[in-house]
Amino acid sequence: KRLRTLKHREHKPFALLCRDLDVASDLVHLSDHAKIQLQSNTRPIMLAMAKQADQFPGVNPGTDRLGVMLPYTPIQHLIFDACEQLDCQRVDVLVMTSANISNEPLIHKNTDALEHMAGICDAILWHDREIVRSVDDSVLMSMQIEEREEVILPMRRARGFVPATLPLPTSVATPGLCVGGELKNTVALVRDNKVILSHHIGDLTHTKSYHYFQQVIEDLC
C-alpha cells in the first residue's frame, strides 16, 4: 500500500521475483512450456493463474493472475541472501517494480535516481558502470484457449527480446519508420525484409515520456 501511494500506482499489478522455479510453481500454475520460458535467457515476467486466490491482494488487485519472474542478474540472488540475513528467516519472494513515477520513463542514471527517487526508496543500490539505455521487463502470458494446447502470448516485448529482428514475407524498396500510437507505444524500423522493433516505451502522455520516445527513435535509426 505504501509503495502504491509513493509511486502513484493505485491499481496496476506488481510483479513477484521468486527465488527459484520451485517457489514460482508454488504460487501459480505453470506448464512445462511456461517453465522453459521463465528459465530462458530472456527471463520474462510470466502472467499465470494464481493457485491461491487473494494470497497477495495488494499485489494483483482485481485479477486472478500473478506475474512471476526469476532472478536474471547475480545481484538479485545476493539481495535474496541479504534480506534473509536482515530478517533472520528465508525470503523467497520479493515485490518488484520499476524505478519511476507512474507514466514517467524509467530512471537509469544515478543522479536522477537520487533526485527523483529519494522520497520513495529507503535505499538505493547502484553500480559505478553507467546504464546507457533503460528497458522494461518483458511480459508473457500463459493462456489456455478452449480445448487447444496452451499458448504463450507476448504482452510486452522488451528486455531479452529486443532489438532482435523479425522477418517480413517480402522486402521493401525504401526503409521506413513506424512510430505507433500515443498509448502503449513501441516504434519499428523496416528495412529490406526485416522489421526491428524497439522495446516497450509506454504512454506518451507525459513530456518526459515523449522525449524518451524521441531518443529511442534516434537510437534505432
Predicted region positions:
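Active-site-adjacent structural elements in enzyme catalytic cores
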Residues: 1-221
